[in-house]
Amino acid sequence: MMDMFFAYLLVASATPLFIWLDNKKVALSAIPPIILMWVFFFFYATESLSPLGHTLMIILFAVNVIVAHIAAFIIYGLPYLRRKRSS
């Protein structure tokens, strides 16, 4: 589980850079959860994360995955559907 979390953390950290030109608001809104995930990862790596902290870390991870998919749909899916509908 932690390997998957760390891999996602690295990808999520770069995501605002990829979407900056398409939607600055979405890119900026992605930064606070990324910072929180790095904080949780630091506590996990130093073995000072409580069971509640583990639970919050997994919840934050799941929420961030869901928000990232919604953002991807808003940025890339909706314009595609609008172009398809108008033609």
Curated annotation (Swiss-Prot):
Keyword terms of this UniProt record: Cell membrane, Germination, Membrane, Transmembrane, Transmembrane helix
A Pfam entry, by short name: YwcE
Membrane topology: Multi-pass membrane protein
The keyword Transcription regulation belongs to this UniProt entry's keyword annotation: no
Bilayer-spanning residue ranges: 1-21, 26-46, 56-76
Record flagged with keyword Protein biosynthesis: no
Coiled-coil portions: none
Up-regulation conditions: Repressed by AbrB during growth and activated at the onset of sporulation in a Spo0A-dependent manner.
Cellular localisation: Cell membrane; Spore membrane; Spore outer membrane
InterPro entries assigned: Spore_morphogenesis_YwcE
Cellular component GO terms held in the UniProt record: outer endospore membrane; plasma membrane
Lineage: superkingdom: Bacteria
GO terms for biological process, alphabetical: spore germination
Family, as annotated: Belongs to the YwcE family.
Protein task: Required for proper spore morphogenesis. Important for spore germination.
Record protein name field: Spore morphogenesis and germination protein YwcE
Organism, as annotated: Bacillus subtilis (strain 168)
Gene giving rise to this polypeptide: ywcE
